[in-house]
Amino acid sequence: MYLNVIAFDLDGTIAQDDRVNPQTWVKLAEAKAKGFKLMLVTGRCFDDLKTIGPFEEYCKAIVAENGALVYFPDNETLVMPFGQLAKEVKDQLLASNIPLEIGKAIMATRVPHDKTVLKVLGRTNFAAIAEYNKGAIMVLPHGATKGSGLLFALNELGLSAHNMISIGDAENDRSMFEQAELAVAVQNAT
């Protein structure tokens, strides 16, 4: 087995409370220097990542917003391979007056507001999908998962999932695990 790609989750995997341990940055730099292609794969909104750290200095791709958005730092290209959320879904969620986190390609809230999200999806004939993760519910374009976003990034970079290890901790990491040759759930995984 030849592994040359490391795909890793953020929250609960390499970060705790919006903080990456300085030693983790050292290990990421060492892995990159040894020739590993690093890929951050997170449910976080893309714009939030800059406050946590300089991932673009380490990663060949940043798969954000639960796979709905992929950023390639080498050429500063931002891609939404599954499109944007349907306008009717966005409009109805905004009108529902629930707390929302709004990304470039997704919207998210927390339980117990998932009931409102599911009603909106039903009223819009399921023009989007929903995924739960640690008490959050993310509303995504059809086809977007961490695994599908990661496969898109690998394909664009000419890399293979057969040479990839994926590391994560939560239910939204399962699709990423399914793509990898080797999958690792960290000790505190849920």
Where do the model's predicted regions map?
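Asp-based phosphoryl-transfer active-site loop
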Residues: Y2-R19, F177
